Amino acid sequence: SRGLGDVYKRQPYDRIETDFKMIRDAGMNVIRIAESTWSTWEPEEGVFDFTHLHRMLDCAAKYELNVIVGTPTYAVPSWLAKKYPDILAVTHNGKELYGHRQNMDITNPDYLHHAQIIIEKLMEQVKDYDCVIGFQLDNETKPYDTCSKYAQAKFVEYLKNEFPDIDEFNREFGLDYWSNRVDDWDAFPDIRGTINMSLDAEYKKFQRKLVTDFFAWQADIVKKYKRDDQFITHNFDFEWHDYSYGMQPEVNQYEAAKCMDIAGCDIYHPSQSSLSGREITACGNIARGIKGDNYLVLETEAAGNHPWLPYPGQLRLQAISHIANGACMVEYWHWHSIHNAIESYWKGVLSHDLRPNRLYKECSVIGNELKKYGHRLVNLKKTNRFAVIADNASLTGLNEFKLNNESDSNYNTVFRWLCDALYLMNIEYDVIPADPALFASYENILVPALYSATDDVLNALNEFVANGGNMVVTFKSAFSDEHLKIRHDVQPYIINKALGMQYDEFTLPDNVTVSCGGKSSKARDWMEMVDCTTATPVAMYEHKHWGVHAAITENSYGKGRAMYLATLFGEDTLIEALKLFFGEQKNEFDASYPVVIKRGTNTQGEKIIYLLNYSDDEQTVTCHADGLKKLCDDSTVSAGDCIALAPWDFSILYAD
């Protein structure tokens, strides 16, 4: 059913009854507890005290609140770090010190031994509570750049399994360069010293596998205790650019989630006049793509960081936007603003005075609205015609070989460039891995900077176009193989056939302009000197010397078409190029941003349409379809009717 809730942390004084009653009265029905509480449950080795846990669970049952219990393993107690100093990770930057969270070596056997004990002890305490609906594994887990003796020994075994022939390993990674050759696995050098980007990228891939294995290990422990009606999840997060931005570089979320029942995520974003809905959509689509299904928002801001205090109405719009994107739950980090330590100014629903306030009242509006019609919004299913590929290996590749050393632009910059353009065009899209088995499910695929790819993936993209698909590919695609070895053939490798273009020169733009559809913008960060073979130039570089080369091309190949974007340029120009390629994407309201349209089918088989106003001004849209009704009052909306949307407001329509 509907889910709106909070992460509950202990207070500076006892008010659990007051808090849980307030949570219930606000229409919230879920709390998340127990993560980062290891030292509370086990204040010294072998001494356990779950008094506060039972008080929370008993009170949750009293107020009919559902509970998600987190395993408390992402913050280690001081006694554990003192007894086993090697638990603190050794990284590229040296040895970690005790104090902050997520500073441990997740391959350390002493850490894993004691983590298993506390997980099992916790599970024994909670297994008989009906109010516990699920379990969260750890918290925003990463490998924490562990380069310990345990991790590096596992890496060598991983390589030996991948490359039984050590000579093949040396050839594949180009280790004869700079006298880096390895001829004895037992003499494998410390990975922290490598200058070989292929080897470094392989270690990062291995570190992602450590996270996958860590989750599978925890899930196996939890499964010994969980009931069939309980779920296992995790709060996956994203690359951080002062807020959630794009694909997480340190976790292969597709693989990591295989041991889970439902994917969860933490999405934070700008607010006030900067609230655009972009992060809710881009990161939410990543989350929905992790298991190809609905997901849980296990954390998002109520107030959060200083600039994020929402305008009136924005909190409600944000919650509905998550649900419109396929989320089945929206939880706030956190219930109340805390009074000590590093996140003292990461504001919760309640401020430091713990009194009902504006945000609490707005949460109450959301919660009580969802009581009425949440059952018709939850588990929204989408059938999107567009997909954007997100690829861990390519992300790593562009971290190893930056686009521009003078810029912060990276893989996620290119990923979000395409995603945000689709969003502003009111085109809903899925985010998928570079898995050929998924390509045929879509009519249109966008490929941002697929720097690292196998022959099979590239041939599958050619086949997708040949069979009638439409494909947009950006610069820095098909440049290296899966181990970051640069291809020694025409670039972009293999897919130049579908694209009908090629290049062998590239540089950084210097006063270069790209124009399309009446919009012009400066090229930035990277440009390729593209020559058309069978493609038609859509836009040439506007430059005295580089004007002979194409910046945007379009090609017919088999039954389909392909566009290539040879440089990074302004959003308005990109939107014009995509309109030219895909055609105008009409909707039944002819609405354009800042009115965002999302849609799907609910469990009852009704078509649900969301009209979301992401602006500080009233917006009016005209309906061009019959047979629609407003969810709030069942009033009919017919062709020609106008719907007014107040600032930061929304309307939900349905059709049988």
Feature map (PLM): residue ranges:
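Short, acidic/polar
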Residues: R10-I23, S244-A256, Y311-A319
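Aromatic-lined substrate-binding rim segments of carbohydrate-active enzymes
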Residues: E17-R24, R32-H92, Q218-Y225
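Carbohydrate-binding surfaces of carbohydrate-active enzymes
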Residues: W185-F188, A216, K224, D228, ...
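Aromatic- and glycine-enriched glycan-recognition loops and surfaces
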Residues: R10-R24, E44-D58, I117, L210-W217, ...
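Short, well-ordered coil/turn segments that N-cap beta-strands
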Residues: R2, G27-N29, A61-V67, D128-I133, ...
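Polysaccharide-binding and catalytic clefts of secreted carbohydrate-active enzymes
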Residues: H92-I262, D266-S273, G277-I280
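Short, small-residue-biased leader/transition segments that mark boundaries at the very start
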Residues: S1-Y8
